[in-house]
Amino acid sequence: MKVLVIGGAGYIGSHAVRELVKEGNDVLVLDALYTGHRKAVDPKAKFYQGDIEDTFLVSKILRDEKIDAVMHFAAYSLVPESVKKPLKYYDNNVTGMISLLQAMNDANVKYLVFSSSAATYGIPKKLPITEDTPLNPINPYGETKMMMEKIMAWADKADGIKYTALRYFNVAGASSDGSIGEDHAPETHLIPNILKSAISGDGKFTIFGDDYDTKDGTNVRDYVQVEDLIDAHILALKHMMKTNKSDVFNLGTAHGYSNLEILESAKKVTGIDIPYTMGPRRGGDPDSLVADSTKARTVLGWKPKHENVDDVIATAWKWHKSHPKGYEDK
């Protein structure tokens, strides 16, 4: 199968590329390298540098390479930044999706796996969150993901482009061999920031907010390991092509951990006492997000291998220890 991975040089996309290659697929990558890393891309994948909003380029790649399916990871994804710069997010994320669907329709490519988000749910009235939980995003990032899902649904009705939207909870960890992992600049995610602080010993790690409606006052999140996440993408693609139906799945472990619990787990995994300071809340952060992923486990046969957060952090630690400066290509 020929798969185009858009955003395939990014954190999650690069893991998808690697696993698709490992399974024997013919993999192509399109990435503008705004935030991604060329070094993260599996050398067996064919690489194009370009923007998802370049409809002509995307359409040409789809036609010339005779692509069977697309995986879409190319969206801005920082909640606080989206609150400060909403137009940047609507422009890139929503316009990018429209451009991609136009290109897919032009090239008669009918299968799309989309990187959606639990941010589409906003502040749920009850936990865990199922796929039927109402969508009510509280920040521009979550709203763009919701809009992208709705656009795909209309494109399915109008043009027959089938899609699977995978609503991620908090993605973490790295490849089990430690060769690729998370490298953002600036880094905003909790686990890599804790581990970077463990390596540097600078004592500059900050937890944002201790007045949330949770057991210890800090955010509670559901952490899904990145390789487990990619297993779900590949299962979803196969299921969609077999059934020729669009669908939506939550991807999480159904276990919620507070920021302070993650810090304690990181101390245990690393063997390092990691000091921290408590800062103010960040804009747009819900109190708790915990997934009910029964549907993915039942329909797709998804079986995450890293359900214990210590195991997730251990894979991230392996990457950060061996790559303390990330890919060093920026």
Swiss-Prot record:
Pathway: Carbohydrate metabolism; galactose metabolism. Disulfide bonds: none annotated. GO terms for molecular function: UDP-glucose 4-epimerase activity. CDD domains: UDP_G4E_1_SDR_e (cd05247). The keyword Aminoacyl-tRNA synthetase does not apply. NAD(+) binds at residues 11-12, 31-36, 51-52, 73-77, 92, 117, 141, 145, 169. Keywords: Carbohydrate metabolism, Galactose metabolism, Isomerase, NAD. One of its GO terms (biological process) is galactose catabolic process via UDP-galactose, Leloir pathway. InterPro entries: Epimerase_deHydtase (IPR001509), NAD(P)-bd_dom_sf (IPR036291), UDP_G4E (IPR005886). Substrate binds at S117, Y141, N170, H189, L190, T206, I207, F208, R221, R282, G283, G284, D285. The active site is at Y141. It catalyses: UDP-alpha-D-glucose = UDP-alpha-D-galactose. The keyword NAD applies. It is an enzyme of class 5 (isomerase). Induction: Seems to be constitutively expressed. Its cofactor is NAD(+). Its EC number is 5.1.3.2. PANTHER family: UDP-ARABINOSE 4-EPIMERASE 1, UDP-GLUCOSE 4-EPIMERASE. Homodimer. Belongs to the NAD(P)-dependent epimerase/dehydratase family. Involved in the metabolism of galactose. Catalyzes the conversion of UDP-galactose (UDP-Gal) to UDP-glucose (UDP-Glc) through a mechanism involving the transient reduction of NAD. It also could be involved in preparation of carbohydrate residues for incorporation into complex polymers, such as exopolysaccharides. This is UDP-glucose 4-epimerase. It comes from Lactobacillus helveticus. The gene is galE.
